[in-house]
């Protein structure tokens, strides 16, 4: 009995015909590795400047809507609207987004680039929503990660601890962060990150634990309510007057804001 490729037509034959069918083993065992994918495809975005990468992240949702309208081609890469069964070598919007984040994080290794990224990413909506203080390279790297596919990025060497700590933080603070579980399951995302790390044989030794503590310290200083508090302070004088019209005094800060 000859083995056949795993295709739509052969799956239909498997389900509807009496003949014996087996699929090629090498195709079944083929798995996706984002780190390998990055290595093979980073050249496709090598011309993107730091500013362009940051513009992509800041406008991610709007860009995604345009890209997903139809087959989207840039250079030699095409993101198909209806990809069906996504192959290990196929580009998707999520993979593109993750590659851009990896590229930016690698750029933070240069002091000059770190300063540029730090100054520009501070205005990004998610950074403000998290109330993330940008004090050093690690905090800037966390800022770049916000809104990205953490399980994908976790597969890249040296990105393991930043990924798992951010996933833990999002799961622990999803209510404060305004994350809707029906739209983004933080527990499931954390499970995926752990699965990725286990599959690559990642060992959480003392050095990695120390790195994780540094990221956790930064995230523990986040203030998800800070953006609203700052905005209220901007209108403080007028808000006080309107509160007085209702016979009450405005609270100095939003509940939960230190």
From Swiss-Prot:
<keyword id="KW-1139">Helical capsid protein</keyword>
<dbReference type="InterPro" id="IPR002517">
    <property type="entry name" value="Tospo_nucleocap"/>
</dbReference>
<dbReference type="GO" id="GO:0019029">
    <property type="term" value="C:helical viral capsid"/>
</dbReference>
<dbReference type="GO" id="GO:0003723">
    <property type="term" value="F:RNA binding"/>
</dbReference>
<dbReference type="GO" id="GO:1990904">
    <property type="term" value="C:ribonucleoprotein complex"/>
</dbReference>
<comment type="similarity">
    <text>Belongs to the tospovirus nucleocapsid protein family.</text>
</comment>
<dbReference type="Pfam" id="PF01533">
    <property type="entry name" value="Tospo_nucleocap"/>
</dbReference>
<keyword id="KW-0946">Virion</keyword>
<comment type="function">
    <text>Encapsidates the genome protecting it from nucleases. The encapsidated genomic RNA is termed the nucleocapsid (NC) and serves as template for transcription and replication. The NC have a helical organization.</text>
</comment>
<protein>
    <recommendedName>
        <fullName>Nucleoprotein</fullName>
    </recommendedName>
</protein>
<comment type="subunit">
    <text>Homotrimer. Binds the viral genomic RNA.</text>
</comment>
<keyword id="KW-0687">Ribonucleoprotein</keyword>
<keyword id="KW-0694">RNA-binding</keyword>
<keyword id="KW-0543">Viral nucleoprotein</keyword>
<dbReference type="GO" id="GO:0019013">
    <property type="term" value="C:viral nucleocapsid"/>
</dbReference>
<keyword id="KW-0167">Capsid protein</keyword>
